[in-house]
UniProtKB/Swiss-Prot annotation:
Native species: Homo sapiens
Major localisation: nucleus
Pathological association: Intellectual developmental disorder with hypertelorism and distinctive facies: An autosomal dominant neurodevelopmental disorder characterized by developmental delay and intellectual disability, language defects, and distinctive facial dysmorphism including high hairline, hypertelorism, thin eyebrows, dysmorphic ears, broad nasal bridge and tip, and narrow jaw.
Keywords in alphabetical order: Cell cycle, Cell division, Cyclin, Disease variant, Host-virus interaction, Intellectual disability, Mitosis, Nucleus, Phosphoprotein, Transcription, Transcription regulation
Protein name from the UniProt record: Cyclin-K
Phosphoserine modification, residue list: S324, S328, S329, S340
Single biological process term from Gene Ontology: DNA damage response
GO CC annotations, alphabetized: cyclin K-CDK12 complex; cyclin K-CDK13 complex; cyclin/CDK positive transcription elongation factor complex; nucleoplasm; nucleus
Assembly information from the UniProt record: Regulatory subunit of cyclin-dependent kinases. Identified in a complex with a kinase and the RNA polymerase II holoenzyme. Interacts with POLR2A. Interacts with CDK12 and CDK13. Interacts with CDK9 according to PubMed:10574912; does not interact with CDK9 according to PubMed:22012619.
Amino acid sequence: MKENKENSSPSVTSANLDHTKPCWYWDKKDLAHTPSQLEGLDPATEARYRREGARFIFDVGTRLGLHYDTLATGIIYFHRFYMFHSFKQFPRYVTGACCLFLAGKVEETPKKCKDIIKTARSLLNDVQFGQFGDDPKEEVMVLERILLQTIKFDLQVEHPYQFLLKYAKQLKGDKNKIQKLVQMAWTFVNDSLCTTLSLQWEPEIIAVAVMYLAGRLCKFEIQEWTSKPMYRRWWEQFVQDVPVDVLEDICHQILDLYSQGKQQMPHHTPHQLQQPPSLQPTPQVPQVQQSQPSQSSEPSQPQQKDPQQPAQQQQPAQQPKKPSPQPSSPRQVKRAVVVSPKEENKAAEPPPPKIPKIETTHPPLPPAHPPPDRKPPLAAALGEAEPPGPVDATDLPKVQIPPPAHPAPVHQPPPLPHRPPPPPPSSYMTGMSTTSSYMSGEGYQSLQSMMKTEGPSYGALPPAYGPPAHLPYHPHVYPPNPPPPPVPPPPASFPPPAIPPPTPGYPPPPPTYNPNFPPPPPRLPPTHAVPPHPPPGLGLPPASYPPPAVPPGGQPPVPPPIPPPGMPPVGGLGRAAWMR
């Protein structure tokens, strides 16, 4: 793997990279010296921030009906941005919304900035949405310019999805088994976006690694492929000089993601599919206190959340930002002009009793559907009439109170895509989920069950060549051809042919060809012919021809010139006399 010489230092100016294509791959030692870690953020917290930002982009884009290529492009922008900037300087949710906004325009599936902000408002609580400040749209627009300068306007990104489908077409075997392998590998690609694998390896290598991991978990050994005689291992026809150790390292990083995030799955499941037992009628006040830390930190460490998370999220509204390594002066000036103590108090008063209760009262819908229209009246009912004790969940839908005027609307408008998503690029995607993840509750349990299964679930693939073991059709539908009869051996001698005797009164039959009879002599012309002709086949001139006359000077006479066509010769006149 090439070492990133030009991007390893965050202080590299853009003037030195005007005429060179940036390299977006780093070694692990470079990933241990990111700007966030240089400012005192521990690696575990940075990994959690990257995971939460990637899931936020994935969930917002899924609710807006964006294509998976757009979601992956936005997440790649997010990871590259924080290789030059710190999480302490730029909040992750604002950066995630900005990356999704830019990726929609690059992938030709644009969404309005206000729609992205409204969807983010429905997914985040008040503390998390406070990162957007008083003017969220202006925050995203200002950050977009910084994002473009950071990624050096290199907007085109390749993803492992297309390589995964391309490589799957080269495999041989049962189509159902290969489709199951592709579905599992596709899910691993979705989850790998929450890691830094896209900053370490090319998409071709990641596609091979997830196929390798899916084959191991499915107990499906790839034994036949198109270029098997040329390559010893199946992935060498796609990527060369990649040892097994590299694939094993990528697989371990993906599996470590599930072991690290299993305690934090409630943080991501509200964005996807929440389990019904956690949404049973419970007292609202204690549930609100537990829902806020579940979005940002682990439940087992509530003491670490208080000194870090609120201070970091309220930092943009309380004190000016530190200068960042990249040009961030417009963002710093904007913060100093817009924020004021009065607006802080106004923005902090009404929201707290509303948004967290919405998340604990109503089950989130699947990502492909927007929230129902009855969500804003319920949010208003919970916000205005806050009960001091337990509230029965069956009475909540009957409350009809008009929603108050709120600067940040709670509900999300139905998605209005500018164009339908492109058709699936391969037949393996028929009936396949493109937004699946093993980071949810059910997905993690199914992954654990597959990892604990012992013994191959599929038998060995049949050989691709050789005679079939059974008839391809039923015998009385297409009977097989009978074997040909044996050819008799030739006789040792042939008897003479029987010639019938000649019949009297009829002319004798024409003579037949006899190989022992000599051929007749050639017929010559008669000798009385004048002049006598030479024998056929001889081209020599006869002896009676006189020799050509040669003048004394040794030069044969020159024949007269041939008259031009259409001009008859005139006797007795030369050419000069005739022209007179």
